Regions:
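STAS-typified acidic loop motif
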Residues: 2-33
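Short acidic-hydrophobic, aromatic-tinged amphipathic segments that line or gate anion-handling sites
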Residues: 100-104
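Acidic phosphotransfer microenvironment of two-component signaling modules
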Residues: 84, 106-107
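Amphipathic alpha-helical interaction surfaces in cytosolic regulatory modules
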Residues: 25-98
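Conserved catalytic submotifs in the C-terminal HATPase_c
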Residues: 12, 50, 106
Length: 112
């Protein structure tokens, strides 16, 4: 069973979504609820994946859905601090083609 660690903070008009733990089918519904609450007001968002240990297709589906929701509302969603292990999965699934990914949270905040 997965373990979700999720946080929300603001930095310079950008909302930073701390995405961590193990996001699998068991916790993907809770992850989706937390993401929907966080992005409800629209705006500029950075997904901080520095604490993300593992993510399955269910969690990736939530990320893609939230990116689409944010963009449809005129907002921006990028990701940052993705480990090499997770980046391999994102690359295999072409997520890196759908969402801009920055090496650090600071770089991502400046970019959005």
């Amino acid at each position: 069973m997965g373990s979700l660690a999720f946080s929300v903070k603001s930095e310079g008009g950008v909302t930073i979504l701390g995405i961590g733990g193990v996001i699998d089918t068991g916790v993907a519904p809770q992850f989706e609820i937390e993401m929907k609450k966080a992005v409800a007001g629209g705006g500029r968002f950075v997904g901080d994946c520095s604490q993300l240990e593992h993510i399955t297709s269910a969690g990736i589906g939530v990320l893609i859905a939230m990116k689409n929701t944010i963009q449809a509302a005129g907002g921006t969603f990028v990701m940052s601090a993705v480990s090499d292990k997770i980046m391999k999965v994102f690359t295999m699934l072409n997520l890196d083609k759908l969402v801009r990914i920055y090496p650090t949270v600071g770089e991502a905040v400046k970019a959005v």
